[in-house]
Design a protein with these regions (language model features):
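Active-site gating loops and adjacent loop-to-helix segments of metal-dependent hydrolytic enzymes
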Residues: 188-199, 238-266, 308-321, 325, ...
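Active-site core of metal-dependent hydrolases
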Residues: 259, 263-385
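His/Asp/Glu-enriched, well-ordered alpha-helical/loop segment
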Residues: 337-347, 365-475
Length: 493
């Protein structure tokens, strides 16, 4: 299908069946108007069609191609408004605010009937109402001039730091590879559910496309404090463990390619996943590390010794442990023990009950306490109806919330939100609230040094403590559903 001169797939989510595809053209090129006209001729006109995502096959010289969707018109309109509102929130001046009557949960522990005061950018004081409410809370509010309208009674809700997702690809029908509009939409989808900061994961693509996507992330960061930078999941992956990545785009990380990516990123590249067994894998890990990037071992078929060499060369993360890698075996241990035994390594885990079964999630917390980082690996279909979507240039079918490649059934990312990862850890797996919240806040922040003052976030993130950024969530105490969100002091929900 061709839309506006660019190769594209047109995905029409018809509300009658809640799904429907007008896909690959057969023998002739069709544009969007012809597709819509065909439906009108069948007395089934489609209205309120919206551009919601993009992709670009290898070799295309124009901008990324478009996905057009039609579903619940009111939901689409609501999400457009919500995206605009969240984007505009970062243009507003922050004001001091305070919260009391909450159960505070962060990596340090749990405090009943707790309170917090912020000057609008950072947290200035926290405490417990049972011992110091009349004096310290009111004094802190006066010192930073909190107006009465900006004092929130949490009425027993759970208060946590904002969630930090260091590995996700999109939401709300858009991907982080989709340009500024796609990033804005997908970020809104995650922000609405409590992910206040995010490293934007970019899928495997031709090198020039990857470099262009890195530039887009770089250019957006000054105006969007919620964007922490980019993660390249590809193209330096093992062919045997490619997962849902385009095999035609996988390459060895030669010195020239490393240079091109570092130049294109201009400081916005936070993480890059590399299979260490590739011919230039270890050298590339070392080079990225020296450039200030955190390399990650993943999508690999590395033996134990090679994985250890990767971590010793500077890799500080294991990309979604258990997925897209050789597993544990008593005579061929592989990369997982190398990550688990190394205290320098942060270990990503997708806690959706599908990518990793619950016993293995709990095993991960036992093997590497305080080093498990919940990630979503979420793709464009996140928080959307089941149907047909794209991951890069690859067709994806989503059924029962599970995303698989249409071509071979390989898992193609998730539709998970960190909100769900935390709530299911606490309510279904029996993981302690402190450990679950730590895995979605302090641990991922610490992987990049964001748990201390830095040039990206300014104030540290990951705790509800004085001097930390005003990233604050209020959660329903029964369901752990996100109800209120502040990001960098901005009230975004």
């Amino acid at each position: 299908v061709r839309v506006g001169g660019d190769w594209a797939y047109v995905c029409l989510l018809v509300d009658l069946a809640n799904r429907g595809i007008v896909g690959h053209s057969a023998g002739r090129t069709r544009d969007a108007s012809l597709v819509l006209g065909a439906f009108a001729a069948l007395d089934f006109p489609l209205t309120d069609v919206q551009e919601t995502g993009v992709c670009r096959p290898e070799g295309s010289a124009g901008p990324s191609s478009r996905i057009l969707t039609l579903g619940d018109n009111s939901m689409q309109a609501d999400r457009v408004r919500e995206t605009e509102r969240i984007n505009d929130a970062f243009l507003e001046e922050v004001v001091p605010f305070a919260v009391h009557g909450a159960t505070i949960v962060d990596a340090r522990g749990m405090t009943k009937n707790g309170w917090l005061v912020s000057d609008g950018r950072s947290i200035v004081e926290t405490g417990c109402a049972e011992t110091d409410f009349e004096t310290d809370f009111e004094t802190a509010c006066r010192l930073v001039h909190v107006e009465q309208d900006h004092i929130v009674n949490a009425n027993g809700m759970v208060m946590t730091p904002g969630y930090v997702d260091i590995h996700s690809h999109g939401a709300w029908g858009s991907s982080f590879d989709d340009g500024e509009k796609g990033i804005t939409t997908a970020r809104a989808g995650h922000m609405a559910h409590g992910t206040t900061r995010q490293v934007l994961s970019l899928i495997t693509n031709p090198i020039d496309v990857i470099c262009g996507n890195l530039k887009t992330v770089h250019d957006m960061m000054p105006d969007r404090p919620d964007i922490l930078g980019a993660h390249l999941e590809g193209p330096f992956l093992a062919m045997s463990r490619k997962g849902a990545h385009d095999p035609n785009c996988l390459v060895d990380p030669t010195p020239d390619l490393v240079s091109r990516m570092l130049d294109a990123a201009d400081g916005c590249l936070r993480q890059i996943t590399i299979a260490p067994e590739l011919p230039h894998g270890i050298d590339a890990i070392r080079r990225f590390f020296l450039a200030g990037v955190v390399p990650a071992v993943g999508h690999c078929d590395a033996d134990y010794q090679t994985a250890r060499k990767g971590f010793d060369a500077g890799a500080g993360i294991m990309t979604h442990m258990f997925n897209a890698m050789n597993g544990l075996h008593h005579r061929d241990p592989g990369p997982i023990p190398a990550a688990v035994e190394d205290p320098r390594v942060t270990i990503e885990l997708i806690n959706d009950g599908f990518h990793v079964q619950d016993p293995m999630v709990k095993l991960g917390f036992g093997l590497a306490p305080h080093r498990i980082a919940f990630v979503t690996d979420a793709m464009a279909a996140t928080d959307c109806p089941d149907g047909h979507y794209l991951l890069g240039a690859l067709d994806v079918d989503v059924r029962d919330g599970h995303a698989r490649l249409a071509s071979n059934g390989a898992i193609a990312g998730s539709t998970l939100l960190l909100e769900k990862a935390v709530s299911r850890a606490v309510l279904e797996l029996g993981i302690s609230p402190v450990d679950a919240v730590e895995a979605a806040t302090l641990t991922p922040a610490r992987a990049f040094g964001f748990d201390r003052r830095n040039d990206v976030t300014g104030f540290p993130i990951g705790l509800l403590a004085p001097g930390f950024a005003a990233d604050v969530l209020l959660l329903d105490q029964e369901t752990w559903t996100v109800r209120r969100v502040w990001c960098n002091g901005h009230p975004v929900r």
